[in-house]
Amino acid sequence: MKEMKRRFRLAAVAIVGPIILAGTLGSAQTNPPKEAPPDVPDAIAVPAGLEPVLFAHGSGAQIYTCQAGADGKFAWTLKGPEAELKDRKDKVIGEHSADPTSKLPAWKLKDGSEITGKAAAHVDALDPESVPWLLVNVVSNAGKGQLANVTTIQRVHTHGGQPPDYGCDESHKDAETKSNYSADYYFFAPAK
């Protein structure tokens, strides 16, 4: 009788063990580890109580137009970004552009969620040829996807994107130029 109970326990472990392991692996795939926040200067640190909920690598261009400033001098003025957003597995998840109505920076994901934001703070990039790192406050959310509860964005690890230092004068008024850039975007929402 003892031998039969021992065999039954061994059989149960042999059957149940792989099921438990499969369940554990399955939940690991559906609940990915939380994103770690980037190491940034205090000037663009996110407020307490927020946690990163999404990472995206953006690559594309910063678009500039040649405009006269208040002083009458012409300079390249940022029109907006035009970039593709990819996740850590290099899968395209959305796009980054300027909202056509507000002209504010906008992020739109393939899941239907989208946000617009306004820069709240910046620090110069390590490379003077690169656009600054930013802290962006979200001013509007739409859709029910990953961006639905996002309140803050950090743009970090920028490469390129500054306008050229030539080619903008009165004879080139309203001319447009694109400057290639890439950056990492971290999206933050209230901690759960």
PLM features: what roles do these ranges have?
Residues 2-3, 26, 58:
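N-terminal targeting leaders of exported, membrane, and organelle-targeted proteins
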Residues 2-14:
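Bacterial N-terminal signal peptides that target proteins for export
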Residues 31-62, 70-192:
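Primary mode marks residue(s) on the alpha4-beta5-alpha5 output face of response regulator receiver
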